[in-house]
Amino acid sequence: MTGEDVAARVHAYAWTDRKPGLERTRALLAALGNPEKALKFVHITGSNGKGSTAAMLASVLAAAGYRTGLFTSPHLYRFNERFQVNGAPIPDAALDRLAERVLAAADTLPEHPTEFELMTAIGFLWFAEAGCDLVVVEVGLGGRLDSTNVIPAPEAAVITNIGLEHTAILGSTLAAIAAEKSGILKPGCRAVLYGQSREVGEIVARACVEKNIPLTVTDDSQLTLLSSGLDGQRFTYRGSAPLLLPLLGDYQLRNVMTVLDTVDALRAQGRNISADAVAHGLAAARWPGRLELVHRRPDLIIDGGHNPQCAQALAASLRGLYGEKKLIFLIGVLADKDWQSMVGEVLPLAKAIVTVRPESDRAKDENELAAWVRAQGVPAEAHASIGEALDAALALAGPEDAVCAWGSLYSVGELRHCLGLC
């Protein structure tokens, strides 16, 4: 059975009317022998940047000699990508075997776990079986009631940039969302917060004081950008030697500060992570589908940003890379996102826009999106498939132009597959 076969079986238990809570996950893990109790963790939450932060940190830990698990979501193309050890996705055979075990255990419970709860259990079983020294876990939604929050106190709990997201579940204010995400903070961990609004900072700091948790907040004034281009970004932070980060985008500098402060937190917990390991780990870091340059002449950049904050960060990064040059955009969005604000952020940068419908039942119709773009005064054309849309976008571009495919991780995964990248 392939990873996609397993994904289809697990997806049968997607959220319906089940209430958020940890009881189902705790019961499931108990039925499986509590594999999470054999593991050490770094727990990462936030609205934006948590996946990139997790990937960079996992790369650094692997470079330091630790057998490192990485649990992230969603996947770009293959379900197996969600469960990695030292950068390698779980093999199909192991995924099939562990999924069978998890589903069998789930069937014995009074209330069946949800899709993400099943994935969490599969991940913890795999990381325990693989003998991981540390597991970097990305929260699925929120923090306090996310299924990953059944873990014991992590060595480090990390909160990246927080924005208004999933407001029906997490709350309608930054303070409410920050309180939910602060739910991953447990006595015995060390906390790292990406420096942001006072509203968020006060909530997180208060939670740390209540639980006697040391807190480090990133400091933009301690970062010096030495150079930036399509080959990556060179910088120093808190007096470090110059470091190279191949990931593009201004926002990745914010994320890498969080990574470096987390490394210091882990050192304080007794982990041996040398400066060389940090340099090599960052230089080797990869996070596909996030401002990823996949082709030159013309440049083709793909990005899975999915909300207005991501769109704003993307626009700023593209201006940094291309100045006032107009780009061609290939865009597919989900109808339940604030797509007008998202697309509005890149309209001033657009020479033309090609629209496509992502492979999702929540997708925005490509013809409606193209009509809306044209109404804003930007040329647009719609195509039914990713392959057709990519061909159309590239046909509009000369060798010196740039194409940016963006708007949904669903579209980005399909696009990388079309390009033979996965």
Regions found by a protein language model. Name each.
Residues 1-48, 52-67, 76-77, 190-193, ...:
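N-terminal leader/targeting and accessory segments in enzymes
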Residues 17-18, 22, 26-37, 63-152, ...:
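ATP-dependent carboxylate-amine ligase catalytic core
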Residues 38, 134-137, 145-158, 162-166, ...:
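Nucleotide phosphate-binding/pyrophosphate-handling subdomain across enzymes
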Residues 131-133, 324, 398-400:
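Short, high-confidence coil segments that cap the C-terminus of an alpha-helix
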Residues 194-216, 231, 299-302, 308, ...:
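C-terminal helical cap/extension that packs against the catalytic core
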Residues 408:
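Active-site-proximal loop/hinge segments that shape catalytic or ion-binding/gating pockets
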